[in-house]
Swiss-Prot record:
The keyword Metal-binding applies. One of its GO terms (biological process) is regulation of RNA splicing. InterPro entries: Znf-CCCH_Muscleblind-like, Znf_CCCH. The keyword Secreted does not apply. It holds the Pfam family zf-CCCH_2. PROSITE patterns: ZF_C3H1. Belongs to the muscleblind family. GO terms for molecular function: RNA binding; zinc ion binding. It comes from Gallus gallus. This is Muscleblind-like protein 1. One of its GO terms (cellular component) is cytoplasm. Involved in pre-mRNA alternative splicing regulation. Binds to CUG triplet repeat in RNA.
Amino acid sequence: MAVSVTPIRDTKWLTLEVCREFQRGTCSRPDTECKFAHPSKSCQVENGRVIACFDSLKGRCSRENCKYLHPPPHLKTQLEINGRNNLIQQKNMAMLAQQMQLANAMMPGAPLQPVPMFSVAPSLATNASAAFNPYLGPVSPGLVPAEILPTAPMLVAGNPGVPVPAAAAAAAQKLMRTDRLEVCREYQRGNCNRGENDCRFAHPADSAMIDTNDNTVTVCMDYIKGRCSREKCKYFHPPAHLQAKIKAAQYQVNQAAAAQAAATAAAMGIPQAVLPPLPKRPALEKTNGATAVFNTGIFQYQQALANMQLQQHTAFLPPVPMVHGATPATVSAATTSATSVPFAATATANQIPIISAEHLTSHKYVTQM
């Protein structure tokens, strides 16, 4: 059965959130500095979001009053990254379809069924340990053989009967974002007596960097690696002691992810050699809901399950020699000599007995399974 993935025109990666302060007319930042969109009157805004003009990204929009947003340079860079992530997702979907087609060719009795997008398990929202496991991320739409899916398409990590405190889940969620630092509240009030190089919290020079939802700033990872060349970077450049803190947090997250992946593989009976290395964190994690972040872990996990299923369905069929013109005495002697070998005792018991030509002529054919 041929498998095809119908290309769907997805505009989610072109979607940007509109600045609420701009809608009220109170935004003090221009459109070239604000991290949210400042659409013109001709743009269509739906539910506080606007779609960017694809032709504008290519520099070929000739419409006089375009109903799509023509983003400024910093938002254009963000959309280009979103577009690359979207292309990677489509490429991996095509590769998965080819793999499932090959698996179906090897197992003709395994029909392929489309799998809709769903959350892996409700307990993952409150399971702090499972938050670091890339193999238990949200499942993207794909094609999976029906028999390797459970009755209810859901994977449960850990013990769902044991509740995890909300504080632990919140701490796990905070540790996932190792590229963020909490802003010093005393510094915001102007009362911090510790310097920028001594305080354990961030002292951003520009208040536009601060995310008002959780009072944090996003760290410039290029600056951490010593390669930020932007003249006016919109991300926070931390001092040396905070850089060490970020690197330590990243190391802890990687170690926790590796330990959780190994524990999950051992619990499910998957050999460690089957699981590929842990995927890297996505390039950007934005809070505007526009990024179509692709998680490759689920495809690696599904491929491991498919390999296990192929191994289970592969049965060993021993060759059945046919001896023509042999007498019953010869056959019994051959059987006796074979069973005298220690390791051949179990093999001869499972094989189909040797049938002579005289037996075929004097008896009917009997099919032995």
